Amino acid sequence: MGASVGATSDQEWGHVPVMVEEVLLYLAPRSGGLYIDATVGLGGHTQAILSRSAPDGRVLAIDADAQALAIAERRLSDDGGRVTFVQGRHRDLERIAVAQGFSGCQGILLDLGVSSLQLDDAERGFSFREAGPLDMRMDSEAPVSAEEVVNHWPEQELARVIAAYGEERYARRVAHRIVQARPIRDTAHLAAVVSGAVRSSGGIHPATRTFQAIRIAVNDELGSLEAVMPQALALLAPGGVMAVIAFHSLEDRIVKQFMVRESRGCLCPPRIPVCECGHRVQLDRLTRRPVQASTGEIGRNP
């Protein structure tokens, strides 16, 4: 778990926002500022930004998950009208933000993790620890669920997804076992099938990588990440800050490549003596390397 940056726990809700102190350090919220939490979840980061930007900083809080958004809205109901809540995908960030009057922002946050609300509710289908429907959709209205991927996608495509998005070395074996066991009934059945194909390693559940891969495919998480970062950059005021909290190497790679590219001028190959691309520096990287979660943070958010 780490955060890349360019130029409070709440026991009542059982929610501990990830790396909140680091987020506040780099976003440096101030009164009068405009901020976007593009993945608000249960609202922990938004709450901290509101507190730091009082009395009149404003936050646009976006999430694809209607259940999480409703909880965030309830817990922040005394915000004095400083938060605007919108259900939507962060890949549509620019359209949503402009419609709500949030351009020229001082800070934008993307927390790419799956929330405890989603993991703890077996009915959402994210967890392999309890039986639940094969769902895994962040947006319950989205057309593709895990059931479609697991029970209907061709074996070759399933293997590709598990290898690419789960970095599972036994992807072809796992995909073959899944196809053989169809129809897969629920998440417990899927976890058992995968566990029969993959040995446990390093204390990690054998189904961890496969579940991650299917979730990423269902929600097009990497495509959404690639789509949202240029939009976030376009919405920042001069001197504004974008912070991204990533949880695995696939996300981290996309974020790093974007920030490195946009912190450079000409992107033409060295063999071309005069710039033809016209690319200009778009941001300053505030950290050369991702900010890693502290040991205490990992203990609070394992």
Task: Name what the model sees in each region.
Residues 1-302:
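S-adenosyl-L-methionine-dependent methyltransferase catalytic core, i.e., the SAM/SAH-binding region
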